[in-house]
A protein has these predicted regions:
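Alpha-helical transmembrane segments of multi-pass membrane proteins predominantly involved
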Residues: 13-213
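Intrinsic-disorder-associated, low-complexity terminal segments enriched in Asp/Asn/His/Tyr and depleted
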Residues: 7, 11-12
Length: 213
């Protein structure tokens, strides 16, 4: 007398797949939190550019949940181009040579960043009710937008101001991509991102020339 092994219920398999995809959707949000907080600190410019590049990877990941690969890849490629443009205008002599931990400065930035995260997740829980997107997408976009605004409010340096503006724009792109699927929107966002990068690079060069005797 033989015994046949019963196949696992299809509903359980589908539920397991959905749970895995939901968990993976929160991974880029975690990366955005780490990179966003890291960009607030007094790190060498080279490390800041690496964090900025990783931030665009995580933003691409979240946009990919709403847009097809071709459109989402535009955000990643344009983001890396913006990083290259900004990096080409960096004055290494003005960059910190090591991690510059000023207790009163960086500690305040971390606390302010954590408050922004708390606010972003609180608003995300509310916006989740009326925006047709997952909580990971909404919270990730709000986290980037909030940390970008914080970056703008904490510094007047062209380098950090440009990073703040591009971070804010990335947060907007993540949320807007969940609402509208448009080639025109992707192209317009790319033009604005490159324009901000070129403007930031120009202001960085002007600042460097003014500092020279």
């Amino acid at each position: 007398m033989g015994f046949a092994l019963a196949d696992p219920p299809a509903d359980n398999c589908c539920a397991g797949g959905r749970n895995l995809s939901e968990i993976l959707a929160y991974l880029p949000v975690f990366i955005l939190i780490l990179t966003g907080l890291g960009l607030l600190l007094n790190l060498p410019y080279r490390w800041l550019l690496i964090l900025f590049s990783l931030q665009f990877v995580a933003a691409f990941w979240l946009i990919l949940l709403s847009w097809p690969l071709g459109l989402a890849a535009v955000k990643l490629l344009v983001g890396w181009m913006a990083v290259a443009i900004i990096g080409s205008s960096i004055n290494e002599e003005e960059s910190p040579t090591d991690f510059d931990w000023k207790l009163n400065d960086n500690f305040f930035k971390i606390i302010a960043g954590l408050l922004i995260l708390l606010l972003a997740f609180s608003l995300g829980n509310t916006a989740f009710q009326w925006i047709p997107a997952s909580f990971a997408v909404i919270s990730g976009g709000l986290v980037l937008a909030g940390l970008g605004l914080l970056q703008l409010g904490l510094s007047t340096q062209p380098f950090r101001t440009t990073i703040g503006l591009l971070t804010l724009l990335s947060g907007f792109d993540i949320i807007y991509a969940a609402v509208v699927n448009s080639v025109l929107v992707a192209g317009l966002s790319a033009l604005v991102s490159l324009g901000l990068a070129f403007l930031g690079a120009y202001l960085m060069n002007v600042e460097h020339l003014e500092d020279q005797p």
